[in-house]
Amino acid sequence: SAASDVYKRQVYEDFGELLFTHFGLSGPVILSASAHMARGEAGYTVRIDLKPALDEKTLDARILRDFSAAQNRDFENSLSALLPRSMIPVVIARSGIDPMQKVNSITKQQRRALLETIKCFSVPIACKAPVEDAIVTSGGVKVSEVNAKTMESKLVQGLYFAGELLDVDAYTGGFNLQIAWATGRLAGLSAAAKEFQKPEDAT
């Protein structure tokens, strides 16, 4: 989920694919969440459930099972079946548990801290990617100023709009491409039809 740090409210929640990259967070869920975060100047925090298919009770049982199988190992060597290798050092640091602590000495409170880290992995958003990297942008000509049947401007005769020129943006998944194709085709056909309807110059 994504939440505003200033207004203390959740602005978006979804289930789907997310990527940890060298520059930050990406993936379909983040692209959709960014549509909400881009409209405000307040700081945001993304809270990620790293094991969304497991509720807390089931996840705790899973952790106990993994710990039982690795009770004589160091904590840092007990999570390979639970988390991707690159995530393990980060999750350990967030949990506050000594990576060299033996698994058989980990307390219930420490296990709870690990569970909470996995179920609510917080990432503060420091900045947004530059507009040059955007998949789609918000803003543009108000749709109330455009004839939806022709895509012609209601304010300027003979002027047509399509795609991202319009103040229309949708979640990722091909919707923005469909908007561009559909409005572009309609605008082109409408402009051509209007041109052919012009009376011929008198000779």
Regions found by a protein language model. Give the residues of each.
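Gly/Ser/Thr-rich beta-alpha loop segments that engage phosphate groups in nucleotides
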Residues: 26-29, 141-142, 165, 172-176
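Domain-scale detector for complete catalytic domains at protein termini or as standalone homologs
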Residues: 45, 75-81, 87, 126-127, ...
